[in-house]
């Protein structure tokens, strides 16, 4: 029987809160405490995702574990979460990789340990929000917010050219996402002021509008995957990023964009 707990909310906010607690440990004098809290937080975030998988009804189509709460009522923006058969696997994988990244950092990172571990935990929660977000604006906030921890990971703990690589990564992905924002705003007005993603594929859009919307989403996700010819930020980011950052770039951010490009119901 499905749990009555807000499991998707927990998958998002458990790692984020754990990350904030890690930040609260302060300087590197408390590095061991920061590592311990980070590991506990990462494991807790992973264990929360297990009921999503075990209780998921694979015989049922559509979204499951849905949570719907008004967020910004004036603009009909809701805190709407849900997962399908693909999303639930990505949430599980994302949380598991976070555990591995935290463990791998124990003996490698020597400066600003708390901040490094917190960045990965917070990004893990934000990425789960990307996989579960069913409100377009909520999804967009999560999709863009996960850039900030990655920008810091590259820019602070990266190689000699880390600042250049971090800025290039941030600008490419941010500017690419503006096309997606424009498409969401257009769909918002076409759907009678609604940001509900599940409603967008029902809209009677003309062929020209469909093509333009497809191009906007395709280009936005292509930058983050990345795909040629908008891939030039990736070599710099991979070379300059610390090991954990490269893992996240390869296994999380790129895969998140692939998933949205294939599965987004718009």
Regions found by a protein language model. Give the residues of each.
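Transmembrane helix-loop-helix hairpins at membrane boundaries of multipass inner-membrane proteins
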Residues: 1-7, 22-103, 107-118, 194, ...
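Structural signature of hydrophobic alpha-helical transmembrane segments
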Residues: 3-14, 83-94, 136-149, 210-221
């Amino acid at each position: 029987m499905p749990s009555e707990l807000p499991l998707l909310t927990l998958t998002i906010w458990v790692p984020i809160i754990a990350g904030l607690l890690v930040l609260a440990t302060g300087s590197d004098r408390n590095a061991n405490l920061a590592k311990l809290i980070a590991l506990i937080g990462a494991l807790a975030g992973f264990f929360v995702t297990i009921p999503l998988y075990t209780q998921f009804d694979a015989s049922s189509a559509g979204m499951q574990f849905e949570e719907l709460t008004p967020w910004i009522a004036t603009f009909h923006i809701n805190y709407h979460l849900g997962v399908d058969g693909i999303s639930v696997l990505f949430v599980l994988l994302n949380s598991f990789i976070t555990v591995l990244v935290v463990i791998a950092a124990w003996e490698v990172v020597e400066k600003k340990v708390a901040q490094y571990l917190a960045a990965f935990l917070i990004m893990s929660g934000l990425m789960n929000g990307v996989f579960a977000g069913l409100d377009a604006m909520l999804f967009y906030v999560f999709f863009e917010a996960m850039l900030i921890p990655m920008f810091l990971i590259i820019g602070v703990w990266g190689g000699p050219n880390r600042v250049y690589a971090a800025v290039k990564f941030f600008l490419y992905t941010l500017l690419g996402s503006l096309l997606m924002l424009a498409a969401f705003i257009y769909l918002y007005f076409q759907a009678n002021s609604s940001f509900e993603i599940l409603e967008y594929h029902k809209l009677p859009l003309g062929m020209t509008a469909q093509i333009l919307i497809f191009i906007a989403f395709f280009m936005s996700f292509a930058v983050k995957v990345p795909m040629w010819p908008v891939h030039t930020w990736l070599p710099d980011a991979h070379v300059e990023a610390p090991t954990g950052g490269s893992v996240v770039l390869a296994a999380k951010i790129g895969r998140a964009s692939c998933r949205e490009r294939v599965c987004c119901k718009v």
